[in-house]
Regions:
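Compositionally biased terminal segments of proteins
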Residues: 1-165
């Protein structure tokens, strides 16, 4: 996934009134305001699944994997992938994510307040603190995860989880 692809996708969603926040590697690069590595996909957090599907279908995107109510992947014929994480916002603005194995993950409302840049364009993204929290739970880190999380620590002073110090 190239920076131009990210901007094309975000622009299409903005024009359709679909609000998304970057997550994953592109969110790290967005808050750092520089692309630090290649990206296989675009991770997003959103509430409006139907709007997402309607906005991106004309661009050739369709669901290729996952469950629409929680986490799914959109793909196109060019091999671009969007990993969508669906939240429902509570009255306090927290994003409630239904985990596939049961249970809920709560994205705190303050975690949706970050703005970063991709290819000079302003984009919504999860805050560095919430990005670190997301990486702290649920899976073993790859070398790329270490690189991303260390970059957040070095730039923003966000503490690495104890298991990864």
């Amino acid at each position: 996934m190239e920076a131009a692809d990210v901007i094309e996708i975000i622009k299409a969603l903005d024009e359709a009134g679909v609000v998304v926040w970057l997550d994953g590697g592109w969110a790290v690069d967005a808050v750092l305001e520089v692309q630090t590595r290649k990206h296989d996909d675009l991770d997003i957090v959103l509430a409006d699944v139907e709007g997402l599907l309607a906005a991106l279908a004309p661009k050739g995107f369709a669901v290729v994997d996952g469950k629409l109510h929680t986490n799914f992947v959109l793909g196109d014929a060019g091999g671009r992938r969007i990993d969508a994480h669906v939240v429902n916002f509570d009255d306090a603005g927290n994003g409630i994510f239904q985990m596939l194995g049961g249970g809920e993950w709560v994205f705190p409302a303050a975690g949706f307040e970050s703005i970063g840049t991709v290819a000079g364009q302003r984009v919504r993204c999860l805050t560095p603190e919430v990005q670190m929290q997301c990486h702290a739970n649920g899976y073993e880190w790859t070398q790329t995860d270490f690189q991303d999380m260390r970059a957040l620590r070095d730039r923003f002073g966000v503490e690495l989880p104890e298991a990864y110090r």
